[in-house]
Amino acid sequence: METDRILCGDALEMLRTLPDNSVHCCVTSPPYYALRDYGVDGQIGREDTPAQYVARLTDVFSEVRRVLRPSGTLWLNIADTYAGKGNQGDSVDPKYPNGRTGQTVAINRRVEGCKAKDMIGIPWMLAFALRDSGWYLRSDIIWMKANPMPESCKDRPSRCYEHVFLLTKSRSYYY
């Protein structure tokens, strides 16, 4: 009997290869919105708007929900992003050469409904969208990062936490 398997590839494509109700638990940290460029066309996290990003992840997690057993759980790690002024294009961190996988990319675009430097609210936008699509939103765990990435901002505290949401497919689940 196979007890574990690691699948590498496009999340939707890999999930579609799995049978219904076959997975006990999913632990994931999808690419954050507008923070990295992995050099792959159509990559998650490079959508034009937060709403498109949330919709795309909702589609992926719809497949996760299909493959989870009724008692299964989803543990979702996600962080927020800040809105830009919209006066510049994308900028690449100069310490990474062009084409390097995972280069840091700051997207400086306006976000409808947000002022420049506002937190967008991605974690809760996604959590509420998943709940609306049928997931049970059971818990929000705050992961305090003891050694967070340094930030050059001088007008707010550094981000030192991320959200880990516990979502379930049904009211009765294995915990």
Model-derived features: positions:
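Core catalytic lobe of class I
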Residues: 1-175
